[in-house]
Amino acid sequence: GLVAGLFYREFTKLQDFPEGEYTQLSVAHTHLLALGFMLFLIFLALEKVFALSRHHQLFNSFFWLYNVGVVLTVGMQISHGILTVLGKESNEMISGIAGLGHIFITVGLTVFLVNLGRAIKEPDAGSANASVNA
């Protein structure tokens, strides 16, 4: 996330891109920080309480779907932003791949919520009892 912000600042300066003009590069770092850092801190806390990784198949499905979605979405955001800064038109392919990224994120989050729901309903939540009762 921080590297994306640095890239945005330096790349737009290097290309003499007008300050204040919008490009997808300007929001790529916030997307990476929110989707890649802050949400994973939440996922980590929920893992600690409910031991979600016990359900290996659900957890692995969530992990890979979500991360592939974030990479596709932010990758296309950066590609679109670079094209904007260079004064070139974006095309439908970039929008389509970004849309696939959003779908992967949505499916990944859905799998995560299914896993969380199952873990909440289970009488023994693995590490939850040990850490809550300690």
Set out the residue ranges of the language-model regions:
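Hydrophobic alpha-helical transmembrane segments of multi-pass integral membrane proteins
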Residues: 1-134
